[in-house]
Amino acid sequence: MSGPLDRFARPCFEGFLSSDEKKERKSDFENSEDERRTRIGSLKKKAINASTKFKHSLKKKSGRRKSDGRVSSVSIEDVRDVEELQAVDAFRQSLLMDELLPDRHDDYHMMLRFLKARKFDVEKAKQMWADMIQWRKEFGTDTIIQDFDFEEINEVLKHYPQCYHGVDKEGRPIYIERLGKVDPNRLMQVTSMDRYVRYHVKEFERSFMIKFPSCTISAKRHIDSSTTILDVQGVGLKNFNKSARDLITRLQKIDGDNYPETLHQMFIINAGPGFRLLWNTVKSFLDPKTSAKIHVLGYKYLSKLLEVIDVNELPEFLGGACTCADQGGCMLSDKGPWKNPEIVKMVLHGGAHRARQVVKVLNSEGKVIAYAKPSYTWIKGSDTSTAESGSDAEDIGSPKAIKSFSHLRLTPVREEAKIAGETSLAGSFPGYDEYVPMVDKAVDATWKVKPAIQRVASRGALMSPTVPKDHEGIKARVLVMFMAFLMAVFTFFRTVTKKLPATTTSSPAETQGNAIELGSNGEGVKEECRPPSPVPDLTETDLLNCVTKKLTELEGKIGTLQSKPNEMPYEKEELLNAAVCRVDALEAELIATKKALYEALMRQEELLAYIDRQEEAQFQKMKKKKKKHLFCF
């Protein structure tokens, strides 16, 4: 016998083997090494064929999935700040408790925009959110795309040139308006103000339903804001009559109240000296964060635009290389990722929400402290897509990474905040960012509306809700403390009454023996378990007197709290109402002052333009006179 299995034929093992095992071993030993190699080779071939068939079946399944109208997923990067995560979680819980969070608005980024608009003041953001929900119901915003048909769009664009054209270098859509060519009088002749406002809202809804998701898929990062270019060449008082001012006021109110923080940055180009003077004055009334987004440029604006926009995405009339000649010009082309049929198909099938979203959670120093990689499987009926799970496994090289993907579950953002809080210590360990574990999580699309009152209380996370400050809350707290005190007194009373007889009957010898027994374990134990010092005997009457005294004190405190009035005194209420009225009056005066200042500045701009024209005319006259004198000589 030869081969590596001969070592098992030694006599010393025969005593430990049963007769059946010996027969099996003998039959195995009779096979030659060539036969075993042949068998191993056939097994390898079968394994290779099986894996090939499995791969082909995965490809066929993915092909069938695409032919059924579904599209492959896209990995989208979504960078989030840990503090913003915690703030959004608190805001979301507050909305859930007040039943102000419909399913279609249960979105992390939407709630974050409202928080940013109110500087992360949860109460103010909640009021703004509630007003938005009410406005959408009254205005019919949820169905405006299907219900409203703006037939006069072509005529409107002639008198109010505006369009979306391309994306900037970060993937945001570019919105362009040529304000110098706006004719408000003609605009109000072809449409009404109410219809134009509805058209404006419809375009905003279309942006959130089609344009922003398309840009998100194209850029592979979350997009929910735009870059705006305003061409103010030729703008004058004729462009800002009463109807134009009323329209702008209505549009700004709708945008600011219901679509906050959708402007990434704005470039005002071809701005003359008068406009710059006006802007420097108006800038002082704006929020510094808002004014930082607005860049007022002169006539040499191209280099600044090319820093953020590729030349092929910029229209020719703004100095770019795009003409869109085959689509009637850049103002009519509506160029962008939302015109790509494949991307639109993904958007209509929920690709932007169901994509494989790679979420990076950053700490205050900008370091990645956690990852979340939601892996949505495309499901139709009961057919789960094993192809995508297989591709996920192929992308991960290490066994540890594959193991982390073995238990997939969908988690709402409140758990992301918890994870962010628990992993806040990661930044203090060198090399931690390089080996962050990957966790499958659903980010926006899978939140369920269910009440959750508890907050995350770990380090760096959210604290528990604030204690109510009204008198009813104080009474409740006092009552709880009183009940806890009664329980403690009752427990103490029972303990003392049980131990008193045992203490009186025990002899000094037993006490000494117990002390010796405890001390035999070591010096430290003897120090901790020394016998108690003698105390005077407490009678049942003394205990009852003590408890009665404590109860009397607590009753006095509760009576003091109850005697305080539950309502604000009339004098203070009057003072508060007077202060509110004064604030309203000051706001009205401020609005009137702003309006007068605006009109004065516009008048000043006209005067400056008139002076420039007069100086130019005088200069031309002087040139002509000089030419005549030279000709005479």
From Swiss-Prot:
Gene3D superfamilies: CRAL-TRIO lipid binding domain, N-terminal domain of phosphatidylinositol transfer protein sec14p. Residues 19-38 have a biased composition (Basic and acidic residues). Residues 571-593 form a coiled coil. Residues 42-64 have a biased composition (Basic residues). The keyword Cell membrane applies. The keyword Lyase does not apply. GO terms for biological process: protein transport. Its main location: Golgi. Pfam families: CRAL_TRIO, CRAL_TRIO_N. GO terms for cellular component: Golgi membrane; plasma membrane. It comes from the Eukaryota. Residues 503-514 have a biased composition (Polar residues). It is a peripheral membrane protein. Belongs to the SFH family. Required for transport of secretory proteins from the Golgi complex. Catalyzes the transfer of phosphatidylinositol and phosphatidylcholine between membranes in vitro. This is Phosphatidylinositol/phosphatidylcholine transfer protein SFH8.
